[in-house]
Amino acid sequence: MNNSYAGPSSASADASATRRNSKRPKYSKFTQQELPACKPILTPQWVISVFTLIGLIFVPIGVASLFASNNVVEIVDRYDTECIPKNMTDNKIAYIQNQAINKTCIRKVRVPKDMDQPIYVYYQLDNFYQNHRRYVKSRNDAQLRDEKKANETSGCDPEKTAANGSPIVPCGLIAWSLFNDTYTFTRGNQSLTVNKTNISWKSDRDHKFGSNVFPKNFQNGTLVGGGSLDLNKSLSEQEDLIVWMRTAALPTFRKLYGKIEVDLKKNDIITVVLKNNYNTYSFSGKKKLVLSTTSWLGGKNDFLGIGYLTVGGLCFFLAAAFTVVYFVKPRNS
C-alpha cells in the first residue's frame, strides 16, 4: 500500500521556501548592475590622439578670442581722486557730503584708436559689495511690479518708510543707494548725445518693474542716499534704476550708463563734464568712467583667450610627452 503522506517536516520546508521566494526582489539587469558597459582601453595611441585633438580645437579658439579682445578699444579714466578740490583732499567725506559745494568736474580723454559706434559708456565701481546679503535682500519685488502692492515694504529695512510713516516706493537699500554721477560729452564744439534707452534688460522692464508703478517718498527719509527719480515716470521707464538694481556678484563691477552713437577717430579729444556726486570715499571705493566698443565676444576680456590657449598648449605638451615616452620606452606587449 502506497502512502502519499509527506509528513510535517516536508510541509515546513515548503512553507519556508515560499517565504524566502516572496521576499526576493524582481530580477532586472539594472538592479543587479549587469547592464552592458563600455570600458575603453586607454592605449598610448588613443591618449596621444585625444590630447592632440583637444589642442587643435582649443588653440584656434584661444587665438580668435584674444584677437577679438584686442580689437576692442577701451578708455578707462579714474576720476574720484582727481575731482576733489586740493584744499579738501584730506577730508574727502566732508567734501562729498556738503551739498553747498559744486561737484562739477571737467576731464579730458584722448581716443587711442578709431572707435566705431555704438560706443558704450559705463561707470565702474571698485570695493562696492553689492552682493552683501543684507543689501541684496533689501528690496520688495512685489512692490516694484504691482501698484496695488505699493504699501508692501517687507524686507526693505532700513529704508521702508518716510519720516511721516508713508511707504517708500521703491523701498530698500538697493534703490536708496542709486548711483547719481552724471556725464556729458563734447568733441571740440560738437556735443555727443548719450542714448539711455534700452540700456537695461528687456525682461526686467517688462516683468520686474511695473509700467503703472511710480516713485513715492523716494529719498525723503532722514538720510539721503544716492540719486533721485522722476516722479512722473513709471519704474519701467527709469532704466538707470533698473540697471542699478540688477546687483553685481563681485566688488568690482561696471554698469551701463548709455551709448554714444557716433564714430570717434584716433586722437580725438573728448571733454567730459561730470558731476562727482556719489560717495565712494566713506568705504575707500574707486570710481571710473569707461568708454568701450564691443566685438562678437563682447567687451575687452583677455582671460577667455588666455584660458583656451593655456589648456590647448598643455594638451599639446602632454601629447608630445606621451609620444616621446612611447617611442623611447615602449610598453612590452
Question: Language-model segments: what does each one mean?
Answer:
Residues A17-L42, I84-Q97, F283-T294:
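Membrane-proximal N-terminal segments immediately preceding the first transmembrane helix
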Residues T31-N71:
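Internal alpha-helical transmembrane segments
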Residues F67-T89:
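Alpha-helical transmembrane signal-anchor/signal-peptide segments
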Residues K92-K103, M245-T252:
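Extracellular beta-rich ligand/substrate-recognition surface
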Residues V121, Y257-L291:
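Extended, hydrophilic extramembrane loops/domains of integral membrane proteins
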Residues L297-S333:
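Juxtamembrane interface at the cytosolic side of transmembrane helices
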